[in-house]
C-alpha cells in the first residue's frame, strides 16, 4: 500500500496535527454516575478492561450447526472447500487470508475454521477473523484524504463486516465521485450544554480536509477502514437506499456468511448458544421462549429436542414473528409455533382458547420502534450482515432536509416530505412489512394457562451493554438502568407462573449491568422460595458478582449474590480470553409452588 498521506498546508491540516489521526483507538464514554456504579461492581481496573473490549468486535465468528440437517464435520469441510474454491487470498465472502510461499494450504484453512473447544458445544464452529490492522490511508501528495463520516450505529455494523449503506452516511468530502477511494470515520455522540449527548453533524455536511471540519478533533483515532465510493457525493445524499461505500480495507476483518449454507448453519454469539444448551430441553417437552426474535435460541432449542415436542416462541412485533417462522422453515423445523404476544401478557386471565385470531391488518404489520423489544443494532439500510442473536434493530439516520428521490427513470425525480421520510424510516426499522412476506399472517395469542410449560427461556430485553462493538454508552443513566430491571422483574413474574412445578427457568441478558443480572436473581430467590439456582452445563462463563451497592445518594441498596450463588450463574466478561459479548445466564429449578 502507499505511504501515509502528506497533505499540503494550503489544502489540509498540518501533518504534525494529524499524528495518530488515521487510527482506530476508541474510548467508550459513560455517564459519570453509571461509570462509578460499574467501577464499584467490578473494580476500576477490571471495568476499564471491559470498556476497552466493548469498543472492539470479537476476533472470530461463532457458527451453530443444524445437526438435524448436517454434522459439524460435514459443515466444517464444506466451509473449507468454499475457502479453497475462492482461493486462500479471498476467503469466505471477502475474508483475506494471506498465502505464504511454501505453506500448506490445508494448514491455512484449518487455522481459519476450528471446532469449539468447550465441552458440550460440539455443534459449534469458530471462524477466525483478524485485527486490529494498521492501515495506510492513501492520498496524493498535494491533496487531503477524501473522507466519508458515518453514524455510530453504521460504524458498529461495518466493524462487524457490513458495507456502508446510504442511510448511515452523515458527511462527505467535496468532489467525491463514484470509484474514488475514501477513508471512513465515525461521528460519536459528544456532550452538549444541556447535559445530554448529540452527534452534532447535519446530514449532508461537506468536509474540506481542514481542522475546521465538523468533529475534526473528535474523529481522531476513529477511522474504521477505507473503501471505494459506490456513488458520487450528490448521489449519496439524493437517494434513500443502496451501498455508499464498498469496504476494501478494514481495521477488523471478519468473515461474512450471507447466503452460505443456508439452513445448515446459523451465526450466533457463543453465550446465546450456551443459554439454549443450559435450558437442556428434552424431546417431547413443551418449551416457551418468551422473547424469541430473531429465532436463534428458538431454533437451537428445537434442534436440541430433535424437533420432537413443542417450542412456543413469542414476540410482540408482527415482522419479528415472521422472521422466526422464516428461520424455522429454512432449518426444516416443525415443532416451533410462533405467536404475536407481549411477554408481559403471556399468562392468560380467561378460559378462552389460546389462539384468538390472525394479525392481518396493515397497521398491525407496521409498528413503531417502541413496539420492538430487541435491544441492539445489527443492520444498516435494512441489509442484514452477520446477523446474530439479540441484534436486529435496523440502523437509520434521519436527515433534517427533504430527500430528492431518483427513480430508475433518470428523468423522474421528486422531493419527499419529512413526514413521508419518517414513515419510510419506520418501515425500515421494522423490516419489509407483512405484505412482502410469503403468507404474511401470524397467529395472535391471548396468553397461556399457568403451569403449562416444562421449561421457560426468558432472554429478556435489556440495556444491551454487553454487545460488541459499542462505540458509545452515554445514553444509559442509573434511572434508565433501574427501569430496565423493573421491566425484567415483571417478565420474570410471568415466567414463574407459566412453568410447571419440577420445571426449569433460564434467565439471560446481553448486558454487563448487575442490576439486570445478579439483582434479578436476588429478587427471584427472595420472592419465590420454591426457586433454587441450578448448576449449568456447559459452563463457559465466569462467576457472578458478590455483595451489594448503594445507589441514589445511599437511598437505595442493590443486593447481589452470595459466594455460593455466584458460582452457580454464568457471567461472560468481554475482556476475558473467551473474547465474546458481555452476557449473563441464571438457571432456576422450580419446586412445589405455594397455593
Functional labels for PLM-detected ranges:
Residues 287, 311, 457:
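Short glycine-aspartate micro-motif
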Residues 264-265, 336, 531, 569:
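Short, conserved active-site loop motifs that form the nucleotide-linked donor/cofactor pocket
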Residues 333-343, 437-438:
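Conserved SAM-binding strand-loop segment of SAM-dependent methyltransferases
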Residues 74-75, 193-196, 336-337, 468-469, ...:
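Intrinsically disordered, low-complexity regions enriched in proline, serine, glycine
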Residues 284, 307-309, 499-505:
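Short glycine-dipeptide loop
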Residues 2-304, 314, 318, 322, ...:
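Glycine-rich nucleotide cofactor-binding entry segment
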Residues 100-106, 344-473, 477-481, 485, ...:
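C-terminal catalytic and target-recognition region of SAM-dependent MTase-like enzymes
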Residues 327, 490-495:
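Short, conserved SAM-binding segment of the class I
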Amino acid at each position: 500500500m502507499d505511504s501515509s498521506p502528506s497533505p499540503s498546508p494550503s489544502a489540509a491540516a498540518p501533518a504534525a496535527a494529524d499524528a495518530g489521526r488515521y487510527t482506530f483507538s476508541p474510548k467508550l464514554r459513560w455517564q459519570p454516575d453509571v461509570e462509578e456504579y460499574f467501577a464499584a461492581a467490578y473494580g476500576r481496573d477490571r471495568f476499564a478492561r471491559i470498556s476497552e473490549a466493548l469498543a472492539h468486535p470479537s476476533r472470530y465468528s461463532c457458527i451453530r450447526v443444524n445437526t438435524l440437517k448436517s454434522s459439524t464435520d460435514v459443515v466444517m469441510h464444506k466451509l473449507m472447500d468454499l475457502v479453497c474454491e475462492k482461493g486462500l487470498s479471498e476467503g469466505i465472502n471477502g475474508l483475506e487470508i494471506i498465502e505464504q510461499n511454501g505453506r500448506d494450504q490445508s494448514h491455512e484453512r484449518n487455522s481459519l475454521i476450528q471446532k469449539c473447544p468447550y465441552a458440550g458445544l460440539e455443534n459449534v464452529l469458530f471462524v477466525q477473523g483478524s485485527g486490529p490492522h494498521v492501515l495506510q490511508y492513501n492520498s496524493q501528495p498535494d491533496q487531503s484524504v477524501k473522507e466519508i463520516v458515518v453514524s455510530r450505529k453504521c460504524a458498529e455494523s461495518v466493524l462487524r463486516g457490513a458495507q456502508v449503506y446510504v442511510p448511515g452516511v452523515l458527511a462527505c468530502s467535496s468532489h467525491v465521485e463514484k470509484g474514488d477511494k475514501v477513508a471512513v470515520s465515525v461521528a460519536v455522540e459528544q456532550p452538549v450544554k444541556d447535559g445530554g449527548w448529540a452527534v452534532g453533524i447535519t446530514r449532508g455536511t461537506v468536509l474540506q480536509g481542514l481542522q475546521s471540519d465538523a468533529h475534526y478533533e473528535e474523529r481522531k483515532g476513529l477511522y474504521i477502514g477505507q473503501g471505494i465510493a459506490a456513488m458520487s457525493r450528490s448521489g449519496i445524499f439524493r437517494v434513500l437506499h443502496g451501498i455508499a461505500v464498498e469496504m476494501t480495507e478494514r481495521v477488523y476483518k471478519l468473515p461474512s456468511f450471507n447466503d452460505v449454507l443456508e439452513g445448515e448453519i446459523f451465526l450466533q454469539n457463543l453465550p446465546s448458544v450456551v443459554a439454549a444448551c443450559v435450558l437442556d430441553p428434552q424431546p417431547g417437552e413443551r418449551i416457551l421462549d418468551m422473547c424469541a426474535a430473531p429465532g436463534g435460541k428458538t431454533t437451537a432449542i428445537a434442534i436440541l429436542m430433535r424437533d420432537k415436542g413443542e417450542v412456543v416462541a413469542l414476540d410482540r412485533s408482527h415482522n419479528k414473528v415472521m422472521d422466526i417462522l422464516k428461520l424455522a422453515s429454512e432449518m426444516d423445523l416443525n415443532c416451533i409455533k410462533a405467536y404475536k404476544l407481549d411477554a408481559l401478557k403471556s399468562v392468560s386471565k380467561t378460559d378462552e382458547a389460546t389462539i384468538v385470531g390472525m394479525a392481518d391488518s396493515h397497521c398491525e404489520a407496521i409498528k413503531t420502534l417502541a413496539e420492538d423489544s430487541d435491544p441492539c443494532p445489527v443492520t444498516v439500510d435494512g441489509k442484514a450482515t452477520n446477523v446474530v442473536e439479540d441484534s436486529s434493530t435496523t440502523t437509520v439516520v434521519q436527515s433534517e432536509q427533504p430527500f430528492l428521490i431518483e427513480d430508475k427513470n433518470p428523468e423522474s425525480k421528486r422531493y419527499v416530505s419529512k413526514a413521508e421520510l419518517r414513515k419510510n424510516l419506520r418501515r425500515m426499522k421494522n423490516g419489509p412489512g407483512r405484505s412482502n412476506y410469503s403468507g404474511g399472517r401470524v397467529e395472535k395469542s391471548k396468553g397461556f394457562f399457568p403451569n403449562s410449560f416444562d421449561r421457560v427461556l426468558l432472554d429478556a430485553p435489556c440495556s444491551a451493554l454487553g454487545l460488541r462493538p459499542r462505540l458509545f454508552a452515554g445514553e444509559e443513566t442509573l434511572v434508565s438502568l433501574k427501569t430496565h430491571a423493573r421491566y425484567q422483574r415483571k417478565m420474570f413474574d410471568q415466567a414463574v407462573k407459566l412453568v410447571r412445578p419440577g420445571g426449569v427457568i433460564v434467565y439471560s441478558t446481553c448486558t454487563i449491568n448487575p442490576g439486570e443480572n445478579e439483582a434479578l436473581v436476588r429478587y427471584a430467590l427472595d420472592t419465590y422460595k420454591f426457586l433454587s439456582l441450578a448448576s449449568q452445563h456447559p459452563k463457559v462463563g465466569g462467576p457472578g458478582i458478590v455483595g451489594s451497592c448503594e445507589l441514589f445518594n445511599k437511598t437505595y441498596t442493590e443486593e447481589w449474590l452470595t459466594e455460593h450463588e455466584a458460582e452457580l450463574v454464568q457471567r461472560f466478561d468481554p475482556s476475558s480470553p473467551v473474547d465474546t459479548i458481555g452476557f449473563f445466564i441464571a438457571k432456576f429449578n422450580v419446586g412445589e409452588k405455594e397455593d
